[in-house]
């Protein structure tokens, strides 16, 4: 998706609730297919999730059909993390990191596109960092989910999401340098640059025991 200036979209990595993200996403999908039971069970057992939706005038206690908002909007709203006072947790990262990852000077401007093209998993590594990068980049796509209800939204494109455990694993792999760089990468130090800035974002999520969402607009 291009913005109105025909430039590449701006990519954002933001903290989300990673403790219920997998269950919530699956519940939304099942509800769209006519089975509200998982969604209702989750709403009834998770007051923060229920309150998030209610604050956005989306009461689904009587079923998904009672809320006209899209699945992508419900995903963003429902997984918004709150502090002890019920206020939204803000991403405490600096503008330099945000700008560096926002519109990378290569290809489609997506920093994960560059990583997935020019880096890889070391052959001796027992864990594959690329699997997590793939999920963060395409986990909510039509190609992965079989529908475009998360990928397409009025505010942009939701690319992928990692739950809390996956985010912790990614932080550990990035910190240990568990990735390799292709010798022919076009931007000298490009992979290392993206990994360095991405690690800052991931560490913030891990510090707060949260997951990570990748979207563009």
Predicted regions and their residues:
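A cross-kingdom marker for long, charged
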Residues: 211-213, 217
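Acidic (Asp/Glu-rich) sequence patches and key acidic residues
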Residues: 1-200, 204, 216
